[in-house]
């Protein structure tokens, strides 16, 4: 059990106290320009630091989260805070903490740590909730604020909407202005998270393995090396210093080329690439091939099934999962359920069905046997252990598994939030998509969606051959560019 610290706060109490009669229109920071589209996307609030995510906005977010959480959570404890390495992180952390403490909450700031660390510490500390300041795999100029409930899972859409109603001045619930909280630095709690990753595994189980880690200049730069060395692995680290200017830039889980080269050059057994907040991971085999979340789910599913730890051989994944994975799993007597893109949808379906394994092709993997949320470090440790115990290489496991259908994914940047949100009202684009679906029929799939984390429209085409996938991807991307982007004079 994590206990309240006995030492004094690291800085003084707030020097102001809100009037008990204050309203949203009289709050001193209530002058932030808000978009017409919802603030909360599939992974919290994200945007460019200094534009959408300013200090006044973070203050409001913190204050209204501090009003909402106590009304729906019985835990009397603190809110757990963490952040990645982005340059805007400290600014947002201080403003967010000011809002939370102004609302009467106590803040425990873990400092630099992976997102799953915040979720874990929240779940074991009787916390009222958690909050992570990160934009995950997004570029350095972006940032984000993501809340967790007291159980360490992502905050429900209902509570996110209540927080947003306060920010927008439409809240219809009572507010507390009579107390203020304290702020504590608690970086030592990160060690408890690291211990939780080791506890289900045999000490030294990775001895004899050489593993390359690409840490993306992000949240796992300190945690990941300690965790893997603690299991006996020999590790080579890439992009392993905190660097807010370079987080995710040409590295990590969205840019695998450096890791692929390093695995081959060092004759390593395998490699792992994390994103900026380390809640997802992709692997590289000894031949330099990328191993995505579909393969990770397949291998882990086989292992859990053999141990009788996978009820009904059910795996929950998203609409992005490759048909080759689904067909191979079905042939083994398994079952695949698909959800919308977003690990919160995967988690909800897992809860509904009692599934013990789920995840996304992008590398978010959830296994309730070992963790409460998607965790890149947990996934990497278990995959490495699985490979070691198999007696063969990851490359051999891949060769014995399944062939993927060619799948192309293109991201088209659309800055206009309204156009992104309402793309389905664009008749020429919808017509092009329908033509593609008719042409592909049973030979492939089309998926077009607005990203919930980046200002892009994602176009995915999967087909029985690469030429077919390329042709329809190009047609749909062209339609997006012609009809959703502003015309040039």
From Swiss-Prot:
Record-annotated active site: 136
Catalytic activity: alpha-D-glucosamine 1-phosphate = D-glucosamine 6-phosphate
Enzyme Commission number(s): 5.4.2.10
Phosphoserine found at: 136
Pfam families: PGM_PMM_I, PGM_PMM_II, PGM_PMM_III, PGM_PMM_IV
Signal sequence annotation: none
Cofactor: Mg(2+)
A cellular component term, taken from the record's GO annotations: cytosol
GO BP terms, alphabetized: carbohydrate metabolic process; peptidoglycan biosynthetic process; UDP-N-acetylglucosamine biosynthetic process
EC top class named in words: isomerase
InterPro entries xrefs: A-D-PHexomutase_a/b/a-I, A-D-PHexomutase_a/b/a-I/II/III, A-D-PHexomutase_a/b/a-II, A-D-PHexomutase_a/b/a-III, A-D-PHexomutase_C, A-D-PHexomutase_C_sf, A-D-PHexomutase_CS, Alpha-D-phosphohexomutase_SF
CC cofactor note: Binds 1 Mg(2+) ion per subunit.
Spans traversing the lipid bilayer: none
Keywords: Isomerase, Magnesium, Metal-binding, Phosphoprotein
A GO term, aspect molecular function: phosphoglucosamine mutase activity
PTM field: Activated by phosphorylation.
Binding site for Mg(2+): 136, 275, 277, 279
Family matches, as Gene3D superfamilies: Alpha-D-Glucose-1,6-Bisphosphate, subunit A, domain 3, Alpha-D-phosphohexomutase, C-terminal domain
Assigned protein family: Belongs to the phosphohexose mutase family.
Role this protein plays: Catalyzes the conversion of glucosamine-6-phosphate to glucosamine-1-phosphate.
NCBIfam families according to UniProt: glmM (TIGR01455)
UniProt-recorded name of the protein: Phosphoglucosamine mutase
Species name: Trichodesmium erythraeum (strain IMS101)
The gene coding this protein: glmM
């Amino acid at each position: 059990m994590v206990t309240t610290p006995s030492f004094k706060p690291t800085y003084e109490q707030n020097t102001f106290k809100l009037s008990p009669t204050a309203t949203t229109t009289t709050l001193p920071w209530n002058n932030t320009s808000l978009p017409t589209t919802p603030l909360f996307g599939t992974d919290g609030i994200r945007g460019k630091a200094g534009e959408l995510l300013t200090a006044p906005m973070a203050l409001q977010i913190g204050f209204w989260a501090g009003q909402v959480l106590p009304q729906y959570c019985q835990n009397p404890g603190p809110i757990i805070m963490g952040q990645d390495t982005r340059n805007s992180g400290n600014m947002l952390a201080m403003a967010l903490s000011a809002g939370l403490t102004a609302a009467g909450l106590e803040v425990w700031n873990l400092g630099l740590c992976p997102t799953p660390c915040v979720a874990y510490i929240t779940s074991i500390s009787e916390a009222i909730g958690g909050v992570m300041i990160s934009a995950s795999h997004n570029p350095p100029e972006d940032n984000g604020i993501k809340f967790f409930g007291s159980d360490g899972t992502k905050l429900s859409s209902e509570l996110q909407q209540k927080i947003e109603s306060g920010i927008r001045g439409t809240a219809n619930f009572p507010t507390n202005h009579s107390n203020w909280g304290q702020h504590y630095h608690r970086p030592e709690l990160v060690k408890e998270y690291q211990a939780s990753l080791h506890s289900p595994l045999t000490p030294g189980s990775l001895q004899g393995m050489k593993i390359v880690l690409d840490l993306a200049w992000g949240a796992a730069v300190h945690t990941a090396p300690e965790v893997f060395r603690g299991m006996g692995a020999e590790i080579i680290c890439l992009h392993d210093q905190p660097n807010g200017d370079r987080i995710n830039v040409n590295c990590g889980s969205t840019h695998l080329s450096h890791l692929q080269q390093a695995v081959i050059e060092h004759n390593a057994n395998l490699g792992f690439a994390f994103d900026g907040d380390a809640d997802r991971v992709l692997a590289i085999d000894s031949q330099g091939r990328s191993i995505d979340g579909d393969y990770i789910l397949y291998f882990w599913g086989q292992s859990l099934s053999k141990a009788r730890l996978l009820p009904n051989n059910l795996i929950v994944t998203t609409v992005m999962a490759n048909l080759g994975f689904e067909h191979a799993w079905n042939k083994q007597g398994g079952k695949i359920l698909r959800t919308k893109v977003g690990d919160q949808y995967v988690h909800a379906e897992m809860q509904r069905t009692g599934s013990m394994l789920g995840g996304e092709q992008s590398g978010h993997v959830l296994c309730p046997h070992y963790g409460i949320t998607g965790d890149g470090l947990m996934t990497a440790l278990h995959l490495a252990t699985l490979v070691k115990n198999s007696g063969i290489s990851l490359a051999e496991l891949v060769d014995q598994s399944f062939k993927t259908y060619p799948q192309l994914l293109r991201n088209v940047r659309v800055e206009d939030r309204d156009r992104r949100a309402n793309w389905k009202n664009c008749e020429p684009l919808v017509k092009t998509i329908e033509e593609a679906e008719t042409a592909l029929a049973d030979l492939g799939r089309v998926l077009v969606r607005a990203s919930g984390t980046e200002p892009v429209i994602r176009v995915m085409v999967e087909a029985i051959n690469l030429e077919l996938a390329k042709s329809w991807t190009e047609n749909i991307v062209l339609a997006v560019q012609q009809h959703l982007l502003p015309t040039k004079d």
